[in-house]
Amino acid sequence: MPRALLSVSDKSGLIAFARGLADRGFELVSTGGTAKALESAGLPVVAISDVTGFPEMMDGRVKTLHPKVHGGILARREHVADLDAAAAHGITLIDLVVVNLYPFVKAAANPATPFDALVEEIDIGGPSMVRAAAKNFAGVLVVVSPADYDTVLTQLDRPDGPSREFRFELARKAFAHTGAYDTAIASELDAVTYHDEKFVRGTTQGYPASITLGLRKRGDLRYGENPHQHAAWYAEESPVGLGAAQRLQGKELSYTNLLDLDAALRIVLEFGEPAAAFIKHTNPCGAAIGSRASDAYVRAREADPLSAFGAVVGLNRPIDLEAAKAIVSTKIDCVIAPSVDPEARAILAAKSQMRVVITDIEQLEQLKTRDVRSVLGAVLVQDGDRVVEAATPWPSNDLRVVTKRQPTTLEWNAMRFAWRLCAHVKSNTVIFTNVSQTLAIGAGQMSRVDAVNVARMKAGNDSLRGSVAASDAFFPFRDGLDAVADAGATAVVQPGGSMKDAEVIAAADEHGLAMVFTGRRHFRH
């Protein structure tokens, strides 16, 4: 009788799979909660303690670390000496190992999980069994994902049993599974410090001496930025982020869709108010806040209706009926939001080619972002850039009014809005806004004067009189500030820090502008 060992944290599909194994003549050996679940379903189960002759002990820390378990997994079926050793020591062969690991990643994703509790989610016996079975894939099937249960049963029904190729594919998945698991543990522990005689999570500054990225393939992409470039996308084991987003309708997401969705989310996450961002080539062409999602959407679209055509759009509120009506009135490529109301689904379905994606915005708020980029022969890693001032009422002690004229309340609110946006536009950038809507965006220019001129060109016949301007970095000379004033802005927010700050401040005073220094630069390359 073939023997299967089952020990899983994720019990989805477990009972049906175990019943399928039992129907095919397998003896079921199991541990702890898995055994209880199988017994409750009426399946015959051999307890792991009956196999080892030792009880499960130390709160389940020691269950499967025993020669009668690992010998049964590692014995090579084609080696007579291995089989003789197993027989001499009363070791029964194990033909199938079904294991998925303690939910460390889920526990680590919750900042409130205490360090001691997190340590208890580090699986020891599970990875050992998985690696042993994967090493001996020629004789043992190893299953780490419920998604493979049906395929395993189908393979078992083959006249000559599971193919060697299939066995190897399961082994490859198993090693990737344990590798990603160990990477998640190492990454989490890298952010732990010892302080006041206790371990504290998420407090380490800087980066470790080595980094291993544990990523799982989500799928192949049709192509990269251009048709001649092959592409795929991968995601961390984290339950949040674009890697966990759900596509409700439309074509498969493309490489550029994913880049633009990321850009859209980064912007709308800056706002507590209903917000919308229209993205083209990772730059916003329009962004706005409003009283509700539909209001924010329409205002963002009207900021640059020409560029809005074919854009990717992000919302930080559910798509309701009114928002859906506004969305289908525009030709856009993709929209992402926290959810879609049922009555809105039918409206959106009329644009069947439009991609509609949902993701949990609240969980994304807690996501610690790190930007990883490849350069020739190396990889660069940095903390993600969020405008932390977004949560602070303006004015605040972190901000410095450097001009003779103080900003009005309306200008303060408009600058706060503009500052949250300019961090997400390619440098050099100068943007013009009112209190709730972009008016003109000068993005990705080689000089700050050019950025202002591009913004003025984008504004066209629409006046920028009475607007505020935000610059992602300091004005190196007064010419950029003169251009801002000539465009019609009445207030400017910028980091400051130029050797020519005094000249720039003098220019602002000459024009009667109010100007605020934040002391923080927001380059985006």
Predicted regions and their residues:
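ATP-dependent carboxylate/acyl-activation modules
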Residues: 1-6, 99, 181-183, 192-525
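N-terminal glycine-/serine-/threonine-rich phosphate-binding loop
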Residues: 1-51
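Anion (oxyanion) recognition and catalysis
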Residues: 22, 39, 123, 134, ...
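Glycine-rich nucleotide/cofactor/substrate-binding loop typically near the N-terminus or early
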Residues: 33-104, 196
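Active-site/ligand-binding-proximal alpha/beta "capping" segment
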Residues: 77-127, 131-134, 401, 406-409
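Mobile "lid/hinge" segments at catalytic clefts and subdomain interfaces of large enzymes
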Residues: 128-129, 136-152
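Non-catalytic interaction/clamp surfaces of large macromolecular machines
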Residues: 147, 151-207
